[in-house]
Amino acid sequence: MLSGKTVKLIVFELLQFACLCIPVFVVMERFASVIRFVKSSDTAYWLVVAASVAYAASVTLFVWVPLKYFMLKTQRFSEVTNWRPVTLAYVILSTLPCFAIIIASSKVQADAAIRFDRLTELPVSLVLFSLICVDIVERIRPLRLTGKASGLDLDLEMPGPVLTHLEQVTSISGHLQANGQDGDASFRSPVSNGSLSGRWEDARTYGLPRTSSSAYLYSHSHSGPFSFLWKRDPRHDLFVSSFMFWLDTVEMVRVAGTNSVFYSGWVFPIYILAYLSLLRVVITPDSPLLALSSILSQDLPFLVVRICLLAVFGYVTPVLYILKNILASISFVYFVFMTKLKLLNRGSMF
């Protein structure tokens, strides 16, 4: 009888394989329908369908299966920590050709002066949903699917802080200076090799100097008649965060599906920039590079394109997303770069 880990592995691999092939088949079939309508020929339709089957078979045999073999058997990519080979292969082998076919469909219909199919509902949604599913599988693969969440980050995950006590705390360095001792020489952190993550290091070390400030003590509240509402699971948060992470790109692709935009030249830069933003899925979720890549590949380019679309086509995109791109870009530049300036790096300001 198969073990739970084996069943989990089989389910994950089948799901990722389905996400690899199904979007290609659906998009190519819709494109074949456009070709049949333009050329009035069933032969062209079946040629496109056959090409999609041949492409999926070739990619599976020569790229996808060898990649999975190297990852699962030889552990060739076991030391890769900042990027994910599976998601990189997916966005190249599945998402890229799907976006290219959608752009080609727009071009074919625009040249033929017809408006047959904008591929807005099922094809585009399926491509983005498959990408999100692959991302979720890669993120949830190390976690258990049954029982309580395990692991250091999951065990230390706080369902929600509750302010239970407030008091004035004098810093450790202040006590040492009062006794004529050097705080930096006497107190040192017991963690020297970075074995603890940054967000928990302050809670587990005692030698970190702090200024005199209010100390907030937190506790978990599980009692009372509404204790059943005080629940949270990191695995559920993973699903929600994965969808929320791509909402901006989803909205940009939705704008490309409107009649006025899809049959114009603006569909090219929109889908190209949307694909560049999708490349962020290659970076691991906890990588420091993710924040900068989000600004450079999504917020700044999307801001420029949305302002141009607003000027050319009117309110085809909500102003809310423009404000989001502006605030995300400004806050990143300010907190990451400008706060390091001497003028803004003073403890007495704000």
Curated annotation (Swiss-Prot):
InterPro entries: Uncharacterised_FAM23-like_TM. Its main location: membrane. The gene is tmem236. Belongs to the TMEM236 family. Keywords: Membrane, Transmembrane, Transmembrane helix. The keyword Chaperone does not apply. GO terms for cellular component: membrane. It is a multi-pass membrane protein. The chain crosses the membrane at residues 9-29, 47-67, 85-105, 120-140, 259-279, 302-322, 325-345. This is Transmembrane protein 236. It is found in: Membrane.
